[in-house]
Amino acid sequence: TVSGAGKLAASYDPDFVLIEEVDLNSTRSYHVNEYTILKECLADYDTVFAQNYDSAFLFYPFTQPHGKSRSGLALFSRYPVTDSLRRSFPVSTSFSKFFDLDRCYSISRVPVDNGKELVIFELHMSAYGNSDAIREGQIRMLSEDMQKEYEAGNYVLCGGDFNHDLKAAEDDSADKESWAYPFPREELPEHFAFCIDQLTAQEKN
């Protein structure tokens, strides 16, 4: 349950919690406001919400339609968030647009004692075989924004639903049937890396 997930997250006493696909009023979650539940579980945290989907009714999948959907990204911070901005990712303009979310990311700022800021990017990227141009455009846009913050002397943290296979190597062709593409790490700015890459093979599994 959402309450169970919120309580589990709180039990780790985290500094930050990033949760995607948080429904405000959606058929799939029986119109329960999941954001309200999470805020109750993480009551002592500052919070930011970035809406990335608002559909009156989605007729997909056809055998069991999503129906009404209103959802987004939720960030919870132990430290005060002084400013936050929602940025829209480029998405497909073809017919598939009607079956995908309005992908976005939020940029939230947390002041640090040395006068700089910790800038937290929370994202939800496109999935289900979108075009290479869309994937590349989303990664390029995100990378440029992160690089600007790095060059300004700020600390940058990025998390969320990448909708990529973060474990797979970019030249790994072992699983061609998977919808999740390996993340093109070479497109990241020089000073950025995935935390998962610091883990051993056993820890990744």
Regions found by a protein language model. Give the residues of each.
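Structured beta-strand-rich core segments of catalytic domains in phosphoester-bond hydrolases
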Residues: 22-117
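Metal-dependent phosphoesterases centered on the DNase I-like endonuclease/exonuclease/phosphatase
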Residues: 130, 134-205
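Active-site environment of divalent metal-dependent phosphoester hydrolases
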Residues: 24-27, 55-58, 127-130, 163-169
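Active-site-proximal beta-strand elements of phosphoester/diester hydrolases
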Residues: 1, 85-87, 117-126, 159
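Glycine-rich, highly charged phosphate/nucleotide-binding loops
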Residues: 1-10
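Metal-dependent phosphoester/phosphodiester hydrolase catalytic core
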Residues: 99, 109-136
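Proline-aspartate-enriched helix->loop->beta-strand connector
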Residues: 9, 13-23
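Structural recognition of the beta-strand scaffold that forms the well-ordered cores
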Residues: 16-20, 49, 119-122, 156-159, ...
